[in-house]
Amino acid sequence: MSVTKSAGSPQVAATVKLDLVSFPESAKKVQSQDPNPVNGSSSESSEKTKGITGFQTLVHLVKGNMGTGILGLPLAVKNAGILMGPLSLLVMGLIACHCMHILVRCAQRFCHRLNKPFMDYGDTVMHGLASSPNTWLQSHAHWGRHAVSFFLIVTQLGFCCVYIVFLADNLKQVVEAVNSTTISCHKNETVVLTPTIDSRLYMLAFLPVLGLLVFIRNLRVLTIFSLLANVSMLVSLVIIGQYIIQGIPDPSQLPLVASWKTYPLFFGTAIFSFESIGVVLPLENKMKDARRFPTILSLGMSIITTLYIAIGALGYLRFGDDIKASITLNLPNCWLYQSVKLLYVVGILCTHALQFYVPAEIIIPLAVSQVSKRWALPVDLSIRLALVCVTCMLAILIPRLDLVLSLVGSVSSSALALIIPPLLEVTTYYGEGMSPLTITKDALISILGFMGFVVGTYQALDELIRSGNSLPLSNSTMFIQ
């Protein structure tokens, strides 16, 4: 969380090259904590001149939210109803955006109070607990930081694992269907797949590319890849959108509100589609003019929520009860609509580096601080390479990885996005006086987050038990953003 940054700083052109020459950003953060005033001034000046612009921040924010989960939202709307589904998505978008604003405000408050240039999620929670009126929370405040760091690492690396599965599965589907793919898109013919190599070999094939991408440690350079990912996914969504609006049948047969028994399925799928709170403070910390961040945050979440509602509602209107787990499975088997999968492969490939950035900025400074400046860069790059290899190996070795990660994500994602922020607001401002309405609001949001934890955990456990004997080596990615 940055306090003073020049709004008029010249925009630095981002160049597509690996930032391997300069000293690692993570090492710079460690140095910036040095009590030596010379080092501190130099680091702060560097941050002012090399921060990211408002547009770059918006690009990263949109990309941090828009992942594979949007493809499953039409089925989620089916489980809620054609009226209840879009309304619920709107409410979830507003709550998620509000929780992000809470986190930013609390971080700003402690930066001003403690005279610090920036503050991450873990620091903010630690100082929030330290300022609470409860003595037990004050004495155990450091555990709040450790818990947040653990949740962030598990969640973000979990996304990276599932992205590898998504890349391999979608490329494999396109290759296997290539012989039956036609030029004409007027008929939705049955696809006869031609068996090819195992999907796990596709995962290994992506590993060298992912290894190069995670070496990019500069958010300004990552903007190029985030922009490419946004364009790829936007084009694919436009292709999907133009198809589903061509033949929308009479919607009067669709239920306005679905059965309460299926609503938890909607809730469990939709709540994790808004999971990007882990990238909020890292982006805000890197901005040249952090005062503009709340506006950019609201704009970005408005774009995401609108896209979610449009794809979810229109997809269900078009296909009704025939909607599949991923809307791409309802598209005709022609090259135009097969290209949607290829575009998403490009988009997710570029997204991997951004999701990897958050856990890297937590883990690497701890290791770099233990070695001399001479070894900082080799240690930095070695840890990045080791982490991406671990995520690839987990994707290869663990059957039904998506369900295992959905189980873990039910705890960590709900805690990070909905449970911790409102409780953090209470611990931060309670001593200064809070209205009963604000306390009630924060309590209700935390209860909603806890419901997401319970529903998501039940859903993942149920799927794990039912799939134990049926699809032991199947990996799907519908529950992870």
Curated annotation (Swiss-Prot):
<dbReference type="InterPro" id="IPR013057">
    <property type="entry name" value="AA_transpt_TM"/>
</dbReference>
<dbReference type="GO" id="GO:0005774">
    <property type="term" value="C:vacuolar membrane"/>
</dbReference>
<feature type="transmembrane region" description="Helical">
    <location>
        <begin position="403"/>
        <end position="423"/>
    </location>
</feature>
<feature type="transmembrane region" description="Helical">
    <location>
        <begin position="221"/>
        <end position="241"/>
    </location>
</feature>
<protein>
    <recommendedName>
        <fullName>Proton-coupled amino acid transporter 2</fullName>
    </recommendedName>
</protein>
<dbReference type="GO" id="GO:0005789">
    <property type="term" value="C:endoplasmic reticulum membrane"/>
</dbReference>
<feature type="transmembrane region" description="Helical">
    <location>
        <begin position="378"/>
        <end position="398"/>
    </location>
</feature>
<dbReference type="GO" id="GO:0015808">
    <property type="term" value="P:L-alanine transport"/>
</dbReference>
<dbReference type="Pfam" id="PF01490">
    <property type="entry name" value="Aa_trans"/>
</dbReference>
<keyword id="KW-0812">Transmembrane</keyword>
<dbReference type="GO" id="GO:0015193">
    <property type="term" value="F:L-proline transmembrane transporter activity"/>
</dbReference>
<feature type="topological domain" description="Extracellular">
    <location>
        <begin position="78"/>
        <end position="79"/>
    </location>
</feature>
<dbReference type="GO" id="GO:0015180">
    <property type="term" value="F:L-alanine transmembrane transporter activity"/>
</dbReference>
<feature type="topological domain" description="Cytoplasmic">
    <location>
        <begin position="1"/>
        <end position="56"/>
    </location>
</feature>
<feature type="transmembrane region" description="Helical">
    <location>
        <begin position="296"/>
        <end position="316"/>
    </location>
</feature>
<feature type="transmembrane region" description="Helical">
    <location>
        <begin position="263"/>
        <end position="283"/>
    </location>
</feature>
<dbReference type="GO" id="GO:0005297">
    <property type="term" value="F:proline:proton symporter activity"/>
</dbReference>
<keyword id="KW-0472">Membrane</keyword>
<dbReference type="GO" id="GO:0022853">
    <property type="term" value="F:active monoatomic ion transmembrane transporter activity"/>
</dbReference>
<keyword id="KW-0256">Endoplasmic reticulum</keyword>
<feature type="topological domain" description="Cytoplasmic">
    <location>
        <begin position="217"/>
        <end position="220"/>
    </location>
</feature>
<dbReference type="GO" id="GO:0005280">
    <property type="term" value="F:amino acid:proton symporter activity"/>
</dbReference>
<feature type="compositionally biased region" description="Polar residues">
    <location>
        <begin position="29"/>
        <end position="40"/>
    </location>
</feature>
<feature type="transmembrane region" description="Helical">
    <location>
        <begin position="57"/>
        <end position="77"/>
    </location>
</feature>
<keyword id="KW-1133">Transmembrane helix</keyword>
<keyword id="KW-1003">Cell membrane</keyword>
<dbReference type="GO" id="GO:0035524">
    <property type="term" value="P:proline transmembrane transport"/>
</dbReference>
<dbReference type="GO" id="GO:0070881">
    <property type="term" value="P:regulation of proline transport"/>
</dbReference>
<dbReference type="GO" id="GO:1902600">
    <property type="term" value="P:proton transmembrane transport"/>
</dbReference>
<feature type="topological domain" description="Extracellular">
    <location>
        <begin position="466"/>
        <end position="481"/>
    </location>
</feature>
<dbReference type="GO" id="GO:0032973">
    <property type="term" value="P:amino acid export across plasma membrane"/>
</dbReference>
<feature type="topological domain" description="Cytoplasmic">
    <location>
        <begin position="101"/>
        <end position="146"/>
    </location>
</feature>
<feature type="transmembrane region" description="Helical">
    <location>
        <begin position="80"/>
        <end position="100"/>
    </location>
</feature>
<feature type="topological domain" description="Extracellular">
    <location>
        <begin position="242"/>
        <end position="262"/>
    </location>
</feature>
<feature type="topological domain" description="Cytoplasmic">
    <location>
        <begin position="424"/>
        <end position="444"/>
    </location>
</feature>
<dbReference type="GO" id="GO:0015187">
    <property type="term" value="F:glycine transmembrane transporter activity"/>
</dbReference>
<dbReference type="GO" id="GO:0015816">
    <property type="term" value="P:glycine transport"/>
</dbReference>
<feature type="topological domain" description="Cytoplasmic">
    <location>
        <begin position="284"/>
        <end position="295"/>
    </location>
</feature>
<feature type="transmembrane region" description="Helical">
    <location>
        <begin position="445"/>
        <end position="465"/>
    </location>
</feature>
<comment type="function">
    <text>Electrogenic proton/amino acid symporter with a high selectivity for the small side chains amino acids glycine, alanine and proline, where both L- and D-enantiomers are transported. Extension of the backbone length, as in beta-alanine and 4-aminobutanoate or methylation of the amino group, as in sarcosine and N,N-dimethylglycine, are also tolerated but decrease transport efficiency. A free carboxyl group is preferred.</text>
</comment>
<keyword id="KW-0967">Endosome</keyword>
<feature type="topological domain" description="Extracellular">
    <location>
        <begin position="168"/>
        <end position="195"/>
    </location>
</feature>
